[in-house]
């Protein structure tokens, strides 16, 4: 379409493409997407006086608004994760608070998978808003935590979840 406009405006012998000739198509996809948005509410989101939770909530609210207005047939679920993961409603998102929690990324991913498993459409994705490293998880022996550096045991479980997501075509 852009080349056709350029030919019409400049003539066949001398092709000059001007900005008025350019046509941009905004295609509308009919496929539906199920999205889970994970938000870290661990203590480090406000540690040392640095407020990371407010920008995280703003990004989350912008993403929700974008999906709800641009893709009204899509679904978006939100969960928070600290020591535990729990679903939160969109209306409660602005009031989300950081707690004296660690970062249980494994629990967050497990809950995200549970939510997506219940969705009927095939297109699924997970977004995670976090400031750092996973520092705890539940094991058969109880609550395991390690805030000092990267813990190989916790990281391995996170990587296992990432492989599971890839296997299930969840980016």
Language model features with spans:
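Acidic, polar low-complexity linker/tail segments
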Residues: 1-36, 43-50, 72
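Structural motif
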Residues: 34-36, 123-127
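Active-site metal-binding loops of divalent metal-dependent hydrolases
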Residues: 41, 132
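Short beta-strand-loop
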Residues: 72-102, 114-119, 137-142
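Von Willebrand factor type A / integrin I
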Residues: 119-121, 133-136, 140-171
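Hydrophobic anchor at the start of a short beta-strand
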Residues: 76, 124, 171
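…and closely analogous acidic/polar surface helices at protein-protein or active-site interfaces
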Residues: 28-34, 43-78, 97-104, 116-117, ...
């Amino acid at each position: 379409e852009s080349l056709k406009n350029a030919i019409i405006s400049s003539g066949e012998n001398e092709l000059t493409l001007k900005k008025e000739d350019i046509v941009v198509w905004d295609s509308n996809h009919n496929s539906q997407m199920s999205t889970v948005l994970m938000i870290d509410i661990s203590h480090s989101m406000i540690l040392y006086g640095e407020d990371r939770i407010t920008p995280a909530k703003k990004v989350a609210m912008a993403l929700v608004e974008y999906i709800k207005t641009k893709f009204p047939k899509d679904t978006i679920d939100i969960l928070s994760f600290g020591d535990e993961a729990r679903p939160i409603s969109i209306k409660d998102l602005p009031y989300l608070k950081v707690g004296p929690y660690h970062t249980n990324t494994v629990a967050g991913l497990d809950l995200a998978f549970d939510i997506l498993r219940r969705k009927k459409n095939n297109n699924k994705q997970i977004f995670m808003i976090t400031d750092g490293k996973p520092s705890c998880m539940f094991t058969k022996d109880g609550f395991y935590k390690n805030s000092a550096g990267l813990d190989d045991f916790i990281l391995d479980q996170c990587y296992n979840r990432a492989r599971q997501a890839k296997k299930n075509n969840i980016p």
